[in-house]
Amino acid sequence: MSALDWLTKQPIAHRGLHDLNQQRWENTLPAFDAAAKAGFAIECDVHLTSDGGVVVFHDDDLQRLAGREGRISELTLAQATALHIGGTTDRAPTLREMLDLVDGRVPLVVELKGIEGRDEGLVAAVAAQLRSYKGKAAIMSFDHHLIRRFSTDAAGIPAGLTAEGTRIENFEAHFSMLAHGISFVSYNVHHLPNPFIRFVREKLHMPTISWTVRDAETQRHSDLNVDQITFEGFDPRALVA
């Protein structure tokens, strides 16, 4: 058994178990609570605010989620958490609020969203909060400049590479990240299979997950190539049943 078996034990709800039919928006406390109650692991996204806080929010631009101009990275933590998501009463939560809500009920995968030159301290800030968290949690990122800080600023916390691409230069860049202490990989499901995933899974025995699976057919494809899915918009348990 691997020390990271918990990471792939159950399907991972992408940005929580969001459902616009119920006005439950992504990366909100209701979406995270719904995922935990359903027994799904949770993926969420975090940004660094202008005053060094950590807010749970996917986009840098505010328009899609908050309906206003501006960037999340330009706001203070107080300003960011005052944003109402999708016109609802739900606010953008802090990472601490999210951790307190989930409270170890299910595993967490926290994706760090970097903006090079404006994210100094993000890795350390997230790591500090996760070190005091009693539940299972991991971090990951697309951003190579952040991944290079994982082994120092987030030592001891399971860390992964979020990746995509099917070209040789993509794989070369991904392989270069193996020197920075990553312990799992999350890959675009539509770019599977590929030599990089095959190598880390079969030769390095790293846990592998896919993103983002939205139907049973794609789930079947993912199951042939990686250990677990990150999903949204359907119930992956139906295929198992």
Residue ranges and their predicted role:
Residues 1-241:
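Phosphate-group recognition and catalysis centered on beta-loop-alpha active-site segments
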